Amino acid sequence: MQLITRLCLLTRKHFVKRELLRLVKLDNQLEIDLNQNLKGRGYYLSVFGLKLDKKHLKAVVEKHLKVSCNDAKLTAMITALQQLAQDEKK
């Protein structure tokens, strides 16, 4: 059985889908897809995003998704990445 992998926007390395946070652009809005089931093109972030400062993380997301990212979404993204990091340790 082959594992499904996706490319991280930050590291440009492949990870298993469950190790990544999926971001989707819907109606010119940034959506965090925790369950990875929203329709639309998905962009993926690994927990490496926690090592970046908020400005750089925001710039990468805005560049690739071509959508503005407010502070609330950025905080939600960081919280979700922290949760992923904790889940990986288990």
Curated annotation (Swiss-Prot):
Any Pfam family hit: YlxR
Highest taxon listed in the record's lineage: Bacteria
InterPro entries associated with the record: YlxR-like_sf, YlxR_dom
SUPFAM superfamilies reported for this sequence: YlxR-like
Protein name (Swiss-Prot/TrEMBL): Uncharacterized protein MG141.1
